């Protein structure tokens, strides 16, 4: 950690979480001068412990993969998801085709510090304990940031000017909330999370290839879901996510029934009662012991209307947040970080205009967000067992970019109509929910063998009628094919080099090569 914040910088990054550390590292490895300001002194606590397999190739690109492997974080072979108490759980298998494809469950204080220290080793000038007080803009261009004022706990203050800004300030989202005022909240994902840590739990599917996978379960009263995530430090993260209104209702009921209890006692009682509404999770808890204290946060899903502008980029939670479900947070942080770095490098190197670079970043972050949003909305549709109208929470332009190849499958024809309809979106949600279709590992593998090339994850999408004709009365094959097809829209994002290096957005794709990182015009 460096001490004296300089008075000027070429590229300045606000925030040392995954998005900020990653963007800064990528840019520093390209030879650019980068300083990073982080308000906390690491390590610091953070929630969001479950990762996707996609994080591994992201870290490989910055030579950090081995550090992740060697740290000792808990292996995540897949994820078990029980959305319906009358059906067996679904399972997303990460390692069936490649044992090295396992993800990790991480203690975020350790993972985030690992990334920040790696950034420093790669040449980023890191300053911790530095709070950004105010961002200043060009007089002749009121949305182009040119400097900021910072402060420390010892009352020292200063100003640093810069040419480029990456705002990875987390949910505070300095640029988005204070200056651009372009944050939009999703009405259908206004939730509250309450969680804590347990010791002495059992594990999911011991003695199988699924052993110790995290468990996610819908509550039987349809008010939310619960998570069970084993960690390498001997604890298990156990939390409940509730619809905000249901959370308020339950607390109000407990307060009226238990007037002699404190707010913290009522919160603990509500938490324990909600865990009882997840019978599969209760079995995994067994005789475990609750440790420490409960924590809570408002899990309000939101996005910015734009993630880039003249000489600035938004990345990670500073721009958008979906929901803890599907563990998309770190993936979207790294996606935003890489896109921010790639488009800044492209603009500096003259690969495109700054306006074109901004357009690429806006679309890249927007489509990645929308892909996961649709899966999450599909899951919540099942959890709540109702035809919730969600059209107003999905930007039509981003829907087109995210699922342009999916619309003909949903509609059952080659020509998509002009507009996005509520019926089409509901069909998409149903389709995406098959990511977690319940299958047994042995029969699933047997079905895969019977399907042959149809089971290729990189093959073309198949519509429902085609799947029905191909599988007939073979229900296991039908479920397997539904699941494979539902994962295809997300599958391409799991390999960041392929996704960034081949997906054409607004006539450009990313040149994923260290030293010449940028955009290539098609």
Swiss-Prot record:
Chloride binds at residues 328-329. SUPFAM superfamilies: FAD/NAD(P)-binding domain (SSF51905). It catalyses: melleolide F + FADH2 + chloride + O2 = 6'-chloromelleolide F + FAD + 2 H2O + H(+). Keywords: FAD, Flavoprotein, Monooxygenase, Oxidoreductase. Melleolide sesquiterpene aryl esters are cytotoxic secondary products with anti-cancer potential. Armillaridin shows therapeutic and radiosensitizing effects on human esophageal cancer cells. Armillaridin induces autophagy-associated cell death in human chronic myelogenous leukemia as well as of hepatocellular carcinoma cells. Armillaridin can also inhibit the differentiation and activation of human macrophages and thus might have potential to be developed as a biological response modifier for inflammatory diseases. GO terms for molecular function: flavin-dependent halogenase activity; monooxygenase activity. Its EC number is 1.14.19.-. Transmembrane segments: none annotated. FAD binds at residues 16, 19, 49, 330. InterPro entries: FAD/NAD-bd_sf, Flavin-dep_Halogenase_NPB, Flavin_halogenase. It is an enzyme of class 1 (oxidoreductase). It comes from the Eukaryota. Belongs to the flavin-dependent halogenase family. Armillaria species are both devastating forest pathogens and some of the largest and oldest terrestrial organisms on Earth. They forage for hosts and achieve immense colony sizes via rhizomorphs, root-like multicellular structures of clonal dispersal. Flavin-dependent halogenase involved in the biosynthesis of melleolides, a range of antifungal and phytotoxic polyketide derivatives composed of an orsellinic acid (OA) moiety esterified to various sesquiterpene alcohols. The halogenase catalyzes the transfer of a single chlorine atom to the melleolide backbone, resulting in a 6'-chloromelleolide product. The enzyme acts on free substrate and does not depend on carrier-protein-dependent acceptor molecules. This is Flavin-dependent halogenase armH1. It comes from Armillaria mellea. The lineage of its organism: Eukaryota, Fungi, Dikarya, Basidiomycota, Agaricomycotina. The gene is armH1.
């Amino acid at each position: 950690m460096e001490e004296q914040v300089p008075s000027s910088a070429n590229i300045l990054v606000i925030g040392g979480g995954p998005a900020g550390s990653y963007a800064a590292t990528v840019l520093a490895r390209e030879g650019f001068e980068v300083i990073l300001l982080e308000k906390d002194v690491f390590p610091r606590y953070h929630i969001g412990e479950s990762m996707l397999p996609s994080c591994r190739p992201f870290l490989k690109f910055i030579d950090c993969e081995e550090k992740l492997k060697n740290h000792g974080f808990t292996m995540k072979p897949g994820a078990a998801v029980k959305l319906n108490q009358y059906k067996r759980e679904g399972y997303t298998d990460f390692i069936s085709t490649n044992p090295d494809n396992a993800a990790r469950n991480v203690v975020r204080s350790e993972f985030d510090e690992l990334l920040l220290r790696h950034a420093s080793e790669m040449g980023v000038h890191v300053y911790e304990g530095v709070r950004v007080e105010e961002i200043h803009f060009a007089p002749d261009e009121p949305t182009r940031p040119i400097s900021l004022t910072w402060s420390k706990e010892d009352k020292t203050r200063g100003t640093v000017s810069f040419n480029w800004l990456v705002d990875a300030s987390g949910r505070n989202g300095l640029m988005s909330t204070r200056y651009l005022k372009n944050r939009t909240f999703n009405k259908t994902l206004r939730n509250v999370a309450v969680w804590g840590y347990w010791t002495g739990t059992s594990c999911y599917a011991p003695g199988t290839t699924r052993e110790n996978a995290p468990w996610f379960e819908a509550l039987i009263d349809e008010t939310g879901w619960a998570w069970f995530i084993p960690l390498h430090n001997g604890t298990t993260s156990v939390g409940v996510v509730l619809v905000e209104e249901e959370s308020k209702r339950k607390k109000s009921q407990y307060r009226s029934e238990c007037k002699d209890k404190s707010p913290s006692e009522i919160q603990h009682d509500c938490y324990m009662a909600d865990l009882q509404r997840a019978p599969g999770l209760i079995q995994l808890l067994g005789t475990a012991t609750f440790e420490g204290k409960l924590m809570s946060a408002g899990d309000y899903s939101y996005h910015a209307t734009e993630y880039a502008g003249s000489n600035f980029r938004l990345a990670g939670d500073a721009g958008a947040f979906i929901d803890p479900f599907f563990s998309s947070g770190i993936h979207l942080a790294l996606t935003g970080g890489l896109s921010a770095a790639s488009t800044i490098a492209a603009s500096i190197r003259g690969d495109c205009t700054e306006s074109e670079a901004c357009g690429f970043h806006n679309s890249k972050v927007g489509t990645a967000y929308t892909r996961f949003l649709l899966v999450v909305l599909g899951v919540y549709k099942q959890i709540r067992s109702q035809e919730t109208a969600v059209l107003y929470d999905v930007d039509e332009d981003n829907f087109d970019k995210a699922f342009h190849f999916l619309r003909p499958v949903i509609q059952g024809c080659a020509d998509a109509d002009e507009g996005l309809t509520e019926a089409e979106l509901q069909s998409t949600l149903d389709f995406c929910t098959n990511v977690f279709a319940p299958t047994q590992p042995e029969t699933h593998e047997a079905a895969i063998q019977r399907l042959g090339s149809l089971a290729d994850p990189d093959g073309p999408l198949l519509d429902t009628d085609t799947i029905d004709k191909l599988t007939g009365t073979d229900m296991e094959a039908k479920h397997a094919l539904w699941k494979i097809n539902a994962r295809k829209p997300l599958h391409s994002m799991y390999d960041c080099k392929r996704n960034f290096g081949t997906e054409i957005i607004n006539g450009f794709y990313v040149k994923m090569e260290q030293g010449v990182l940028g955009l290539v015009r098609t």
